[in-house]
Swiss-Prot record:
EC numbers, comma separated: 5.1.99.6
Keywords: Isomerase, Metal-binding, NAD, NADP, Nucleotide-binding, Potassium
Name of the protein: NAD(P)H-hydrate epimerase
Domain YjeF N-terminal per the UniProt entry, residue ranges: 23-229
Main function: Catalyzes the epimerization of the S- and R-forms of NAD(P)HX, a damaged form of NAD(P)H that is a result of enzymatic or heat-dependent hydration. This is a prerequisite for the S-specific NAD(P)H-hydrate dehydratase to allow the repair of both epimers of NAD(P)HX.
Protein source organism: Microbacterium testaceum (strain StLB037)
Skewed-composition ranges (Basic and acidic residues): 1-18
GO molecular-function terms, A-Z: metal ion binding; NAD(P)HX epimerase activity; nucleotide binding
Keyword NAD: yes
Disordered: region residues: 1-21
Length: 256
């Protein structure tokens, strides 16, 4: 019997197709983003809307509460803005701040929308009860050492120890995966789905990337004209779902 919760049209859209895709280093992606950011393009909000839509589809299939692991950088900002969009459709959205520093605007948006901030200890105690985890701890920022540390590492170790883990959606790359070469520490949370923004990151198809990334969704942020100036780090055959972000409500109103 067909599952009444599943939309056949959406299911067809979300089915990955195998294609050869150019993958880029983190530096190349940042360079491609720079002109758009200089123009004032809201790339983070656009990425977060796409992330929230994909997370909402996951929750429709497997209903339950969502745990957002938010780091200090733009990756955490993406996750927190997505939490704001997701708060109206998920059963509950809990946010764990794994660093003292946080993207304040994104956190304020998430809390205003109904997400609640919980402690690492509370999240760890009830982690098996979540249906979905958004991994927004580390992204593609420049780091000399990408190993998870402190509360982030402890929480990931707790998740790894579960016999039945929640589904995991990685924000841009699984936290701790090197975005260029795909190397990773032993303590890393494998994703069921990775939502990557603007361009495929080389680390998703190199090293441990394929085993840790799950199904890859590639969100179009309009970087293609600028990526032509860069040489791909690698071109790989990969199962990928291409995503076009929905317009913000203000954008639609202006066009109308």
């Amino acid at each position: 019997m067909a599952d009444p919760r599943r939309d056949p049209a959406a299911e067809s859209k979300d089915r990955p197709s195998t294609e050869r895709v150019a993958a880029y280093t983190a530096d190349a992606v940042r360079a491609a983003e720079a002109p758009l950011l200089a123009e004032g393009r809201p790339l983070m909000r656009t990425a977060a809307r796409a992330l929230a839509d994909i997370a909402a589809a996951e929750v429709r299939t497997t209903p339950g509460a969502v745990l957002v692991l938010a780091g200090a950088g733009d990756n955490g900002g993406d996750a927190l803005f997505a939490a704001a969009d997701l708060a109206s459709s998920a059963e509950r959205v809990d946010v764990v701040l794994v660093r003292d520093r946080v993207h304040r605007e994104a956190l304020d948006a998430a809390v205003a929308a109904g997400a609640r901030v919980v402690s690492v200890s509370d999240a760890s105690a009830g982690v098996a009860d979540y249906a979905l985890v958004l991994d927004g701890i580390l992204g593609i920022g420049r780091l000399a050492d990408r190993r998870l540390r402190g509360s982030a590492r402890a929480l990931v170790e707790r998740l790894l120890a579960l016999a039945h883990r929640p589904r995991v959606l990685a924000v841009d790359v699984p936290s701790g995966l090197d975005p260029d070469d795909g190397t990773a520490d032993a303590v890393i949370l494998p994703a069921d789905v990775t939502v990557t923004f603007g361009a495929l990151k080389a680390g998703l198809v190199r090293g441990r990337g394929p085993e840790l990334s799950g199904r890859v969704h590639l969100v179009d942020l309009g970087l293609e004209p600028y990526l032509r100036r860069a040489h791909p780090a690698v071109t790989a055959a990969i199962d990928v779902v291409r995503e076009t972000p929905r317009a913000a409500e203000t954008d639609r109103a202006q066009r109308a």
